[in-house]
Swiss-Prot record:
CDD domains in UniProt: OAT
Subcellular location: Cytoplasm
GO cellular component entries: cytoplasm
Catalysis performed (reactions): N(2)-acetyl-L-ornithine + L-glutamate = N-acetyl-L-glutamate + L-ornithine; L-glutamate + acetyl-CoA = N-acetyl-L-glutamate + CoA + H(+)
UniProt name for this protein: Arginine biosynthesis bifunctional protein ArgJ
PANTHER family reported for this sequence: ARGININE BIOSYNTHESIS BIFUNCTIONAL PROTEIN ARGJ, ARGININE BIOSYNTHESIS BIFUNCTIONAL PROTEIN ARGJ, MITOCHONDRIAL
Gene it is expressed from: argJ
NCBIfam families assigned: ArgJ (TIGR00120), PRK05388.1 (NF003802)
HAMAP family, alphabetized: ArgJ (MF_01106)
Enzyme nomenclature, EC number: 2.3.1.35, 2.3.1.1
Species of the source: Thermosynechococcus vestitus (strain NIES-2133 / IAM M-273 / BP-1)
UniProt pathway annotation: Amino-acid biosynthesis; L-arginine biosynthesis; L-ornithine and N-acetyl-L-glutamate from L-glutamate and N(2)-acetyl-L-ornithine (cyclic): step 1/1; Amino-acid biosynthesis; L-arginine biosynthesis; N(2)-acetyl-L-ornithine from L-glutamate: step 1/4
Organism phylogeny: Bacteria, Bacillati, Cyanobacteriota, Cyanophyceae, Acaryochloridales
Active site: 191 (nucleophile)
Database matches in Pfam families: ArgJ
């Protein structure tokens, strides 16, 4: 049973954080496009970033910054321009962004992290950003989490945010997060971005290790289209403002905090997968029986990323053969005679042999889950995924991955992205 409860507020739920999101004119659509998160005090900062060799200038900047100085006090994020494949001009733009935020807030540029998302190859409109900065900083508030979450959206249909609260040594610890992502989602960190705020006090090396493991179980286990972005970034701040005892070494307290951090990351990851471009439902692939968890996660992610599996789910077609084929090409050796597959609890294969099942019932399950993926108010839901269960043997390894179905709208959205 979890030891926390979900609360409102997103990145500003944790103590000592303010945020803002505004329209700076960076997008032709006039949608919000500039977000800022600020900690009242310097915070321990950890980051996990894309492995794409064409990584964007802000990714290179943040990676370098966190290697030399593991603290930060502000995160600036624009949407509309990725600042990737922009050469020296892009690098200088990142430095200018950090400098203008630092000047406005009164601290060193080294305390500012920068992120971007949008069209690759387009330069950052620095002058528009500079003109908008006074409005952005004036809008900073401890209720600005949702505005910030909306300002980092691109093809996203909904903002993605969460906050958790737990009682801790007679005090309260909170972790908040926001993310964006809808297309070009196949992170290897680690386009997707996630920003996490925490008011616990934790040592830098422990915080980085916690974030890496949390990402391995969440953001690195989602896929929409198999493309790894140039800008994938997860940045987590911990400012110690909860006044709880500092967590300096592994132990019970560190385990509890990591579980809470992982829960935030999993929620945001599932929200990204559900909001995949053109998607109508969330897919959850559960794999068991592997030699270890890493192998299980690899099989799960391969199945979740299969275009044939995704297409079948969109067509509400219980085609288990595509699931079996995807499992077999995951690069994880297993005995085919041990393979078992179930869809929505309906067994379809056991001991490597097909089982008789009612196709109409399986089809009805897929229809039901797709309908439940959008609630009565029209909001997306991550609580009713299409569940695919796969067992590949008798090992103790388990893993989960999330994806979405593949619809005609995915092609339409991406065919018209810059036109």
């Amino acid at each position: 049973m979890s030891h926390w409860q979900q609360i409102t507020g997103g990145v500003t739920a944790a103590k000592g954080y303010r945020a803002a999101g505004i329209t700076a004119g960076l997008k032709a659509s006039g949608a919000p496009d500039l977000a800022l998160i600020v900690s009242d005090v310097p915070a321990i900062a950890a980051g996990v970033f894309t492995t794409n060799h064409m990584c964007a200038a802000p990714v290179r900047y943040c990676r370098q910054r966190l290697q030399t100085k593991g603290t930060a006090q502000a995160i600036l994020c624009n949407s509309g321009q990725a600042n990737a494949a922009t050469g020296e001009q892009g690098w200088q733009a990142v430095l200018a962004q950090a400098d203008m935020v630092a000047t406005a807030l009164g601290f060193s540029p080294e305390m500012v992290l920068v992120a971007s998302t949008g069209v690759i190859g387009q330069p950052i409109p620095l002058e528009k950003m500079r003109q908008a900065l006074p409005t952005l900083t004036a809008n900073l508030s401890d209720g600005g989490g949702e505005a910030a979450a909306r300002a980092i959206m691109t093809t996203d249909l909904v903002p993605k945010q969460i906050a958790l609260e737990a009682e801790w040594e007679g005090q309260t610890i909170r972790i908040g997060g926001m993310a964006k992502g809808s297309g070009m989602i196949h992170p290897k960190m680690a386009t997707m971005l996630a920003f996490i705020t925490c008011d616990a006090a934790v040592s830098p090396h422990l915080w980085q290790e916690m974030l890496q493991r949390a990402c391995d179980r969440s953001f690195n286990q989602i896929t929409v289209d198999g493309d790894t972005s140039t800008n994938d970034s997860v940045i987590a701040l911990a400012n110690g403002q909860s006044r709880t005892p500092a967590i300096a070494e592994p132990g019970a307290a560190a385990t509890r905090l990591e579980e809470m951090l992982t829960a935030v990351c999993v929620h945001l990851a599932k929200a990204i997968a559900r909001d995949g471009e053109g998607a109508t439902c969330l897919i959850e692939v559960q794999v068991s029986g592997a030699s270890d968890d890493t192998a299980a996660r690899q099989v799960a992610r391969t199945i979740a990323s299969s275009m044939l599996v995704k297409s079948a789910i969109y067509g509400r077609d219980p085609n288990w053969g595509r699931i079996a084929a995807a499992a077999g090409r995951a690069g994880v050796p297993f005995d085919a005679s041990n393979l078992a597959i179930a869809l929505g609890g309906i067994p379809m294969m056991r001991h490597g042999q097909p089982l008789p099942f009612d196709p109409a019932a399986a089809h009805a399950y897929l229809v039901q889950q797709a309908a439940a993926s959008t609630d009565a108010s029209g909001q997306q839901s991550i609580d009713h995924p299409v569940v695919i269960e796969v067992s590949i043997g008798s090992g103790s390894g388990r893993g989960v991955a999330w994806g979405c179905d593949l619809s005609y709208d995915y092609v339409k959205i991406n065919a018209e992205y810059t036109t």
